[in-house]
Amino acid sequence: LIKEKDSIFDGVNVLLNSIPPKKNGDLVVKNFSNIIVKKKKTINWFGYFSSTSVYGDHSGNWVDEETELTPNSQRGILRKKSEAQHLKFFKDHKIPIHIFRLPGIYGPGRSVIDKIKEGKAVEIVKEGHFFSRVHVEDIATAIAKSINKSTPGEIFNICDDLPTESYKVLRYAAKLMNVKNFKSLNFDDPKISSKIKSFYHDN
């Protein structure tokens, strides 16, 4: 429990919610909405990190911010619900909500290069299954620009424009590093965990 909850947003004019939603909804909206409404005159910007999992499976076709959301994973369903809660918060109370849909995130210590260096690289081969990616610094840049030019109620996809099969990214990195030996599995291999496979529900 957070003590003195009423004063937690004193002096705050920018909020960024990166907490994954739970089955009963978004934790920030659920637990702090009344306080945020009280402080809305001083809150200039409110961002929410969602996920491209809200789109579901579009068979590898292009999607944008206007594409219908048809999530088929629990992760995507919860994100869609949380987005709706934030947008309702904006419509009902004029809280300056901005939603950012993120794909796979990479950066220092979190990339295929790091996995290759650590000997943990495993390529999962599934032809025609595309992933978009974004570097952590690009996320930070997008957030900074949004804060400087607020557009409440808007949704943004922050990702590259070159979606690719994950195994091709690994092979390219391995080629740059002159590494030839790493584990390779077909997607239907029983060794692949259900958690890993869940990331392949969306295409």
Give a label for each model feature.
Residues 112-134, 138, 142:
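A conserved pocket-lining segment of Rossmann-fold NAD(P)-dependent short-chain dehydrogenase/reductase
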Residues 140-142, 149-196:
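Mid/C-terminal beta-alpha module of Rossmann-like enzyme folds, strongest
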Residues 47, 98-101:
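Rossmann-like NAD(H)/NADP(H) cofactor-binding core
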Residues 80, 93-95, 105-118, 137, ...:
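Glycine/proline-rich active-site loop of Rossmann-fold NAD(P)-dependent oxidoreductases
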Residues 1-3, 20:
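Rossmann-fold cofactor-recognition segment
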Residues 10-48:
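NAD(P)-cofactor binding segment of oxidoreductase domains
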Residues 59-99:
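Catalytic helix-loop patch of NAD(P)-dependent Rossmann-fold dehydrogenases
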Residues 33-74:
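Conserved Rossmann-fold NAD(P)-dependent oxidoreductase catalytic core, especially the SDR/UDP-sugar
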